[in-house]
Amino acid sequence: MISRMEKMTMMMKILIMFALGMNYWSCSGFPVYDYDPSSLRDALSASVVKVNSQSLSPYLFRAFRSSLKRVEVLDENNLVMNLEFSIRETTCRKDSGEDPATCAFQRDYYVSTAVCRSTVKVSAQQVQGVHARCSWSSSTSESYSSEEMIFGDMLGSHKWRNNYLFGLISDESISEQFYDRSLGIMRRVLPPGNRRYPNHRHRARINTDFE
């Protein structure tokens, strides 16, 4: 049986070896970067700003859950942060000039929610560049699934709206989808003799040119 004293001696040796090993790595050129926690907050804030600049939603998005996935140290003053965060539409409109962090979340059942990932370059404690991309969370998809099963093509896929909010589908394409879907519903619901199709020549066109 190993006595208590021997156990304590063994633990002390392990701790000393661990401390010496850490000291060896730091002295041998292993990158050590003690960044300010405010840099993480700035990186998240810059990521949300980037998402809002890319979104076509009239409302601002706000982060409500975030985590730091990885930190890549480039040198003493430069690093790259990989963040993952969830966003949700707020009650503040884009043209309000409000800080998204101060805006209340929308409480609508169909409020848009997404999971985003961003890569943020930080130099001398300042954000220098941000790349962000988002995908719609499973909870958002599930909230639509039951309605789609009940109403079918009357609701259609929710993906068109989600893609529109992040600029993946133009206004004109959305108009085409609504028009084609309405024709499909009329063909199934109305008898052949009672069908009255909208006049193609009088359909409004939406200007999709952006500055």
Curated annotation (Swiss-Prot):
Free-text tissue specificity from the UniProt record: Detected in liver and plasma.
Gene Ontology BP, a term: bone remodeling
Domain of life: Eukaryota
Signal peptide segment: 1-29
Chief localisation class: secreted
Modification type Phosphoserine: residues: S96, S145, S146, S170, S173, S182
Gene3D superfamilies in alphabetical order: 3.10.450.10
This protein's UniProt keywords: Disulfide bond, Phosphoprotein, Secreted, Signal
Cysteines joined through disulfide linkages: C92-C103, C116-C134
InterPro entries reported for this sequence: Cystatin_sf (IPR046350), Spp-24 (IPR010892)
Subcellular location: Secreted
Residues passing through the membrane, by range: none
SUPFAM superfamilies in the cross-refs: Cystatin/monellin
Post-translation changes: Phosphorylation sites are present in the extracellular medium.
GO cellular component, one term: platelet dense granule lumen
Function: Could coordinate an aspect of bone turnover.
Name of protein: Secreted phosphoprotein 24
